[in-house]
Amino acid sequence: PKYQTRESTQSWDNLVSVIFQASRSLALGGRIRYKNKAGTTTERLRLYANLKNAKWFAKTSVDFSVNREASLMENEKGTISRGYMLNENLGTTWRWLRLSGSFGYFHTQDYSSRIYVYEPGLLYQMSFGSFYGEGIRYALVARSEINEHLLVIAKLGTTDYFDRNRISSGKQEIAGSRQMDLEIQVKWKW
């Protein structure tokens, strides 16, 4: 067996995604994923609504996660872990400034039912945060094209946990329930 697996690895992974374009400015969608790998079954569901026009956009989403682990013992039941996240993304453009923000509340039973959510970030970056436990995540991204040569992007994000008073461990341990991150990018075109 491989590391952290119960048996030889075989998997069954299915994904169904549906998008309904109700109008030019409104889209509704859903995605469900079922994955069975080496005695562990993971089910994820996301429902969302996108609303946008020329000046602003909004995306509301709700995510659900269920993780089932089979027991190695015949007479024992496996474990089930559940979680969900409610998330809102908003953004607007005004002259040379583009602002976007996100706010999400998450509540999962443990790391097995963690939720992954995309968060806007800097140029050439993809950010999919992984959230477990109970808490909120909020972030603000500001992008400004000062002139034709200078672009400045800044992102400030915070995660507040309600179920713990320490984050991480070892040399990366934070003695508190809040974790902040700040990223700044400056691009100069010749």
Identify the residue ranges that each predicted region occupies.
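Exposed, low-structure sequence patches enriched in small/polar residues
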Residues: 1-190
